[in-house]
Curated annotation (Swiss-Prot):
Endpoints of the signal sequence: none
EC number: 1.11.1.5
Molecular functions per Gene Ontology: cytochrome-c peroxidase activity; heme binding; metal ion binding; peroxidase activity
Organism field: Emericella nidulans (strain FGSC A4 / ATCC 38163 / CBS 112.46 / NRRL 194 / M139) (Aspergillus nidulans)
Encoding gene (name): ccp1
Residues binding heme b, per UniProt: 245
Family according to the record: Belongs to the peroxidase family. Cytochrome c peroxidase subfamily.
Protein name according to UniProt: Cytochrome c peroxidase, mitochondrial
Cofactor note: Binds 1 heme b (iron(II)-protoporphyrin IX) group per subunit.
Transmembrane segments: none
Domain of life: Eukaryota
Length: 361
């Protein structure tokens, strides 16, 4: 009964938000927004079974897509075949992620989508333009110490969520899988199209990046410019990327912060920016790090770095523009998120070769 009530409540919320979401030319069809009742999280164990028809032996990237070698039959002396995935193969991966998002609702607010976006963001946001290190190429968050960095707390949920997908499509690298999953989540939660291309290679533990390359939510605008500037972003791009806070919520057992940024944490909209501009925010009185709560309902939260976006003149003009123009936010977020996912990746393909995946129906 309680589960049905929660589902009805979420359906009503999404219904009320739908005009704003669908007003954009990038918007998701109505049936794509699926939210069910929340249950306790449980991770799935990866299968240890081996196949006697397909034994993967290695990976060699060629061109814009990967050429993947495997043994037919699984026996010594068996013939070696080469599989070069096409757009249709990557669409199948997208479809599998989208289906799992629709069926696995035992996470915050009924969707793993926001944490998949965070995984793609954090896997990519370690890039350093000066040294050419970090970025999505490598998926080194699979290993300690990077997996144990404070900014990556809680991302095991996202990595575990994708393990069954990796098992089903063993030819895709973790680097490509994590970024494709982020693109899929944004599209399936009503956001803009995220053009994507393969070509990332996985690395071992030696490729782990040092701690401190990701944003610290307790800081101010100077920190934002230092972190994002290291990756090569300008003020407009910085504000657009932080717009990923349209999705998800903070957790006391991870970042130390608590609560969602807006009333629709599983629907991608420009509400984050509208609330920054239109709502009054005050420091929350609680036994935790400094964060801000909305004056109206006292159920939402903002980081100090979020409030810095409206306190800094250079940032605020972009916040106000996105708050007024959802289409502009969707378009510019898509462009800069694609840029983020590709930082430091030695592609052999052209930008014209990017795929735009068909959304689920």
């Amino acid at each position: 009964m309680a589960s049905a009530a929660r589902s009805a409540s979420r359906a009503f919320l999404r219904s009320s938000l739908r005009p704003a979401v669908r007003s954009s030319r990038f918007a998701l069809p109505t049936q794509g927004l699926r939210v069910a009742s929340r249950r306790g999280y449980s991770s799935e164990a990866s299968s240890g079974k081996s196949s006697n028809t397909l034994l993967w032996a290695g990976v060699a990237l060629a061109g814009g897509a990967g050429a993947y070698f495997y043994l037919q039959g699984g026996d010594v002396g068996a013939s070696t075949k080469v599989f070069t995935p096409t757009k249709e193969d990557y669409q199948k991966v997208y479809n599998a992620i989208a289906e799992r998002l629709a069926n696995e609702t035992d996470y915050d607010d009924g969707s793993y989508g926001p944490v998949l976006v965070r995984l793609a963001w954090h896997a990519s946001g370690t890039y350093d333009a000066e040294t050419g290190t970090g970025g999505s190429n490598g998926a080194t968050m699979r290993f300690a110490p990077e997996s144990d960095h404070g900014a990556n707390a809680g991302l095991k949920y996202a990595r575990d969520f994708l393990e069954p997908i990796k098992a089903k499509f063993p030819w895709i690298t973790y680097s490509d899988l994590w970024t494709l999953a982020g693109a899929c989540a944004i599209q399936e939660l009503g956001g803009p199209d995220i053009p994507w291309r393969p070509g990332r290679q996985d690395k071992d533990v030696s490729g782990c990046t040092p701690d401190g390359r990701l944003p610290d939510a307790t800081k101010n605008q100077d920190h934002i410019r230092a972190i994002f500037g290291r990756m090569g972003f300008d003020d407009r791009e910085m504000v657009a990327l932080i717009g990923a806070h349209a999705l998800g919520r903070a957790h006391t057992d991870r970042s130390g912060f608590d609560g969602p940024w807006n009333f629709s944490p599983t629907v991608f909209t420009n509400e984050f920016f509208r609330l920054l501009v239109e709502e009054k925010w005050q420091p929350r009185k609680w036994n935790g790090p400094k964060q801000f709560t909305d004056n109206t309902t006292k159920t939402l939260m903002m980081f100090p770095t979020d409030l810095a976006l409206v306190q800094d003149k250079g940032f605020r003009k972009h916040v106000e523009r996105y708050a007024k123009d959802s289409d502009a936010f969707f378009k510019e977020f898509s462009e800069v998120f694609v840029k983020l996912l590709e930082l430091g990746v030695p592609f052999n393909s052209k930008v014209e070769d990017r795929y735009v995946f068909k959304r689920s129906e």
